[in-house]
Amino acid sequence: MQDSSYKEQVTQAFDQSSSTYDRLGVEFFTPMGRPLVEISEPVTGERVLDIGCGRGACLFPAAEKVGPQGRVHGIDIAPGMIEEARKEAAERGLRNIALDVMDAETPELPARSFDLVMGSYSVIFLPDAVGALARYAGILDHGGRIAFTSPVFRAGTFPFLPPEFTPLIPQALLEHLPEQWRPEALVRRFNSWLERAEDLLRTLERCGYTSVAVTDEPVRMTALSSEAWVDWSHTQGMRLLWQNLPQAQRTELRARLVEGLDKLSDATGALAIDVPVRFVTARVAH
């Protein structure tokens, strides 16, 4: 699959899900965004770029940190995400936020115009993520920082999902995925620089960074019910699996997921699952 086709699929998936993204009774991206902002330590007056900002899981906490003297620029390739983030920014009365539809792989932004670049589960979706990281170094000012999150890739588990989900998704169903989204393709793309901390360290150093820190921490994902989680899964990256499945397989997968997740739920039917997340920070070398 060409990069242009891949990006079109990503854009369409997130654009179509923007109105319900990170909603529907499931908490994950927002609880992951807050600690990413905390470890990146934005301070009053700083200029922050949020790549793949979505509906603002990092954007709004960062805007609070930098205050009215600073600014936060959110970019996303999906117009619907930018529209939803603009609505919320207006509702919050925030004037230190700018939002633009932009390809985060090749951001059209001035050199040395930011103090901090952050991305929550967004860098990993870029076809040339390593090249993008090098370009971000160029738009960071002296002493600027980068902070991003990614899944913790482990052998034998379904990428992007907690290990508990691996036995719930039959391998045969994955054949319906676009080639670049099948687990083996994801492993080839990411494991070369993301799986091991030492590979990630070397990659970031080659891209122009220093003081690299890699920390794996669980982020608690909560859902009101198994059904709520399955509905929510249509609003994030897993949407690409759902929309490529024939109806019969869609029905089968939903039933398998609900049944399996019900076994993990508490007495009220609610779910709480710890998701392994990798937090990465670094400083630009120039």
Swiss-Prot record:
Involved in the biosynthesis of aklavinone which is an important precursor common to the formation of the clinically significant anthracyclines such as carminomycin, daunorubicin (daunomycin), rhodomycin, aclacinomycin T (aklavin) and aclacinomycin A (aclarubicin). These compounds are aromatic polyketide antibiotics that exhibit high cytotoxicity and are widely applied in the chemotherapy of a variety of cancers. Catalyzes the methyl esterification of aklanonic acid to yield aklanonic acid methyl ester. PANTHER family: TRANS-ACONITATE 2-METHYLTRANSFERASE (PTHR43861:SF1), TRANS-ACONITATE 2-METHYLTRANSFERASE-RELATED (PTHR43861). Transmembrane segments: none annotated. It catalyses: aklanonate + S-adenosyl-L-methionine = methyl aklanonate + S-adenosyl-L-homocysteine. This is Aklanonic acid methyltransferase DnrC. Pathway: Antibiotic biosynthesis; daunorubicin biosynthesis; Antibiotic biosynthesis; carminomycin biosynthesis; Antibiotic biosynthesis; rhodomycin biosynthesis; Antibiotic biosynthesis; aclacinomycin biosynthesis. SUPFAM superfamilies: S-adenosyl-L-methionine-dependent methyltransferases. Homodimer. The keyword Methyltransferase applies. Keywords: Antibiotic biosynthesis, Methyltransferase, S-adenosyl-L-methionine, Transferase. InterPro entries: Methyltranfer_dom (IPR025714), SAM-dependent_MTases_sf (IPR029063).
